[in-house]
């Protein structure tokens, strides 16, 4: 959520910054917010004036009674004032609701370093690591090779549940688990993150705090009776861990890593990546979340991105890092990097991690603040997060990049201790 004071102070600057955001966002809502805000402030002045008048009239009553004067006129006027105040308070409540409704739907302001552009084709490549894998034979897609090796079963998952679900079997299940443990151990032991194991269901306030609601409710799986949501990412519960709290400035930056299953309806993605592990309704992910002071946040974003890159380098998977343009930035981020791994079956790089700085956009929604000293005025933290990284897509990348001519898969060295010493899937 944006700072209303900032909108009030620089409305044209805000509208210019949000133009071309790629969110089908109508900048005229900024004018609507300002109109409501002005009405609200005028009503507050009027209410204060009426309350002062009521107080003055009320103060006359004891003296009138002492002097034996009739107070009926004063009581009638006070009743009339109370009625006016009640009506104005009701209007204030309506305005507050309207302002909140609009503010929750205004996207974040892009950082000045965000490239201009309308789609992912306009994202800017920052760097690459490794060379795109080439073969002296015709490589197979992971969905074919995984089935051939009996480590992935899409057909039976479709029978048991439906499309976009998978059974991992045998060494496939063990490979998935190995990737999870390798990622967690590296981020905890080498990068200094504290592990969190979060709930897989959250309430509506949590989904609103991180920005999934109200805009993206159709993408979420909801339990109607409880009004709980299956988490689309561990970002939601881990960020909301400190909702409505004031953190100690001396504890910042705080760094958390969390493994979780993630659940997404993938509304609007019909026909996209329908085969394999790339776009599933349920998938595993290791998430990195940071809480920082404002002046630290962009340095910490670079570190977070490097941490995500580091685990991919350890596996030897070729990747590139791109800076996301305005039109592809998404709703909540101020600046975002995508890490994309090379996928031979697609003959292109495929996103495996998004690393974002939300500045104070989420912390305003979730009311997460910090202060240096007990008597200091609290300020909003900056929140950051990134996949560290998506596990199913990692498995897909391993299968495709490390496949051999005989249909076997070489297991990356970093994973072998988690695989009982095995070095090949056959």
UniProtKB/Swiss-Prot annotation:
Pathway: Aminoacyl-tRNA biosynthesis; selenocysteinyl-tRNA(Sec) biosynthesis; L-seryl-tRNA(Sec) from L-serine and tRNA(Sec): step 1/1
Family annotation (InterPro entries): aa-tRNA-synt_IIb, aa-tRNA-synth_II, aa-tRNA-synth_II/BPL/LPL, Ser-tRNA-ligase_type_1, Ser-tRNA-synth_1_N, SerRS_1_N_sf, SerRS_core, tRNA-bd_arm
Keyword Ligase attached: yes
Predominant subcellular localization, coarse grouping: cytoplasm
EC number: 6.1.1.11
Keyword Repeat: no
SUPFAM superfamilies: Class II aaRS and biotin synthetases (SSF55681), tRNA-binding arm (SSF46589)
Protein name: Serine--tRNA ligase
Species, as recorded: Clostridium tetani (strain Massachusetts / E88)
Keywords attached to this entry: Aminoacyl-tRNA synthetase, ATP-binding, Cytoplasm, Ligase, Nucleotide-binding, Protein biosynthesis
GO CC annotation: cytoplasm
Family affiliation: Belongs to the class-II aminoacyl-tRNA synthetase family. Type-1 seryl-tRNA synthetase subfamily.
Superkingdom in the source lineage: Bacteria
One GO molecular-function entry: serine-tRNA ligase activity
UniProt cross-references to PROSITE patterns, sorted A to Z: AA_TRNA_LIGASE_II
Notes on the domains: Consists of two distinct domains, a catalytic core and a N-terminal extension that is involved in tRNA binding.
One Pfam family named in its UniProt record: tRNA-synt_2b
Alphabetical list of NCBIfam families matching this protein: serS
SUBUNIT field: Homodimer. The tRNA molecule binds across the dimer.
Cell compartment(s), UniProt: Cytoplasm
Entry function: Catalyzes the attachment of serine to tRNA(Ser). Is also able to aminoacylate tRNA(Sec) with serine, to form the misacylated tRNA L-seryl-tRNA(Sec), which will be further converted into selenocysteinyl-tRNA(Sec).
A GO biological process held by the record: selenocysteine biosynthetic process
Residues involved in L-serine binding: 233-235, 287, 387
Catalysed reactions, semicolon-separated: tRNA(Ser) + L-serine + ATP = L-seryl-tRNA(Ser) + AMP + diphosphate + H(+); tRNA(Sec) + L-serine + ATP = L-seryl-tRNA(Sec) + AMP + diphosphate + H(+)
Residues the record lists as binding ATP: 264-266, 351-354
